[in-house]
Each structure stands twice: as C-alpha cells, then as structure tokens.
C-alpha cells in the first residue's frame, strides 16, 4: 500500500511539474504572451547578429546564443512584414545554447523555430558580419546568450559596423538575460 501511495504521489508530482511549471513560470513573467499593439513595417529590413562562440569558458560546456533571444525578435520582425537576415561574428553555423530549448525554458518562438526550415537554414548558414553593410538595414538587433559574452563585445568589426549604423540613424538594440 505504501509503495502504491508513493507511486501515485510521484506520478502526480511529475504531471504537476510537466504541465504546471511552464504555466507558473509564465505567471511569474518568464515568456509572457504580449497582447499589445501590432505594428507593421512592410519593406523594412532587420538584421539579427549573434555570437559565433560555442564553448562556455574552459568548462567545455556547449553554449551560444540563447534561443529565445534570437527567435523572438526574428518572428516579431518577420510578422511585422520585414525581411530578416541573420549574421554572426564569423558566419556559418550559429551555436545555440542547448538548455534554452528545454521544455520549461522554451518560448513559443523557439517551438516555431524548430518547425521552420527557412529560419533554420539562416541559422546554419549565417552571414559573416564583415561582409555586410549594416547601414542597409533599418534595425540591427544583437541577440544575447552566454556565447555573446565571449565575442560580441570584443569584435572590432562589430563595433565599427554598429558605429556606422548608429551614425546613419538606424535603430540598434539587443537583449540578454
């Protein structure tokens, strides 16, 4: 009888955590649904810039851009009618923080990304920042994550590109937890 009770409690706890934890995290402000005004910018161009750094310090642990810090702005810009390009410091495949897609952290935009072959191709084949002219974009967005701490702030090329875009009156922004 005691084993059956323990099993019932364990199953109930697992179900609560699996189904209830995401709702609780949303209630506390993690990945809330935004129900504000929807803005349209048809014909606009946005550039999302991410890290190329894939390892957390000397730990050997995989890292990169935090999923939702790249996917949420991508879909906001895309849904607003903008053309969206994706670039990284070195170009090529963008490393994504593997923990950012775990069920309790994944945002709706992350789930959308996992079903979007067009965006996935952009992430696997990102443009190299030095091959771009940032002044040709209306918005330049820097996506955060642990990897960004290793190369975004130390890239002279990124610094120059952002400086030119800002001087040209472009919108420059970013996010990092």
Report residues per predicted region.
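Extended, subdomain-level signal for the structured scaffold at the beginning of enzyme domains
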Residues: 1-168
């Amino acid at each position: 009888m005691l084993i059956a009770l323990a099993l019932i409690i364990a199953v109930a706890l697992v179900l609560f955590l699996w189904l209830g934890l995401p709702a609780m995290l949303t209630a506390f402000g993690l990945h809330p649904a935004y129900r504000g005004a929807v803005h349209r910018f048809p014909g606009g161009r946005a550039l999302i810039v991410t890290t190329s750094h894939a390892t957390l310090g000397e730990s050997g642990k995989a890292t990169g851009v935090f999923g939702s810090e790249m996917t949420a702005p991508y879909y906001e810009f895309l849904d607003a009618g903008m053309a969206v390009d994706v670039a990284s410091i070195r170009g090529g495949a963008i490393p994504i923080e593997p923990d950012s897609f775990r069920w309790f952290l994944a945002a709706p935009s992350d789930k959308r990304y996992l079903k979007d072959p067009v965006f996935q191709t952009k992430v696997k084949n990102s443009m190299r920042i030095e091959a771009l002219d940032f002044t040709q974009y209306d918005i330049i967005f820097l996506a955060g994550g642990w990897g960004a701490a290793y190369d975004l702030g130390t890239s002279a090329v990124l610094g120059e590109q952002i400086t030119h875009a800002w001087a040209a009156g472009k919108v420059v922004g970013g996010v990092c937890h």
